[in-house]
Amino acid sequence: MVLGAVLILATAGGVAWRRRDGRMRESPVPRLTEGDLGQPLGTRATLLQVSSAFCAPCRATRQLLSDVAGRSDGVAHVEIDVTTRMDLARRLDIRRTPTVLVLGPRGQVTRRASGLPRRADVVAALAVATGEAAP
């Protein structure tokens, strides 16, 4: 009986975690600047990727974000390593890699995702950040 309850709880927890993994959600973090990132912001939006050296999903995320940014005028893809920027990781409450933050033209964080995001979610988050879609 107890084993069955534990299995049900573990399964429910796994399903809930899987549903949130890589999903874009609103973020309460204030603005970030070029000084914070050490690189220029995009004129329309910035895809900020927080990665680590031994993170397998980070490579796929890098390819996805680079491709989306390359196809979108004024969108920059900036990647920072969590091990060299612990100060920023703490400020942004980074708990796992990859974490993706979508910044508007003035560096305001509009969306974030932990884990590998879906392309459609990144494109939709960019539309919100640039004001091309309703939030």
Where do the model's predicted regions map?
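Structural micro-motif
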Residues: 93-101
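The canonical Cys-X-X-Cys-His
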Residues: 55-58, 100
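Membrane-interface amphipathic/juxtamembrane segments adjacent to transmembrane helices
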Residues: 25-44
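Non-catalytic, surface beta->alpha helical segment in thiol-disulfide oxidoreductase systems
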Residues: 102-135
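Short active-site neighborhood of thiol/selenol oxidoreductases, capturing the structured segment around
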Residues: 41-53
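Typically the conserved alpha-helix immediately C-terminal to a functionally engaged Cys/Sec
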Residues: 59-71
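Thiol-based oxidoreductase modules, predominantly thioredoxin-like and allied folds used
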Residues: 73-87
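N-terminal targeting signals for export/organelle localization
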Residues: 1-31
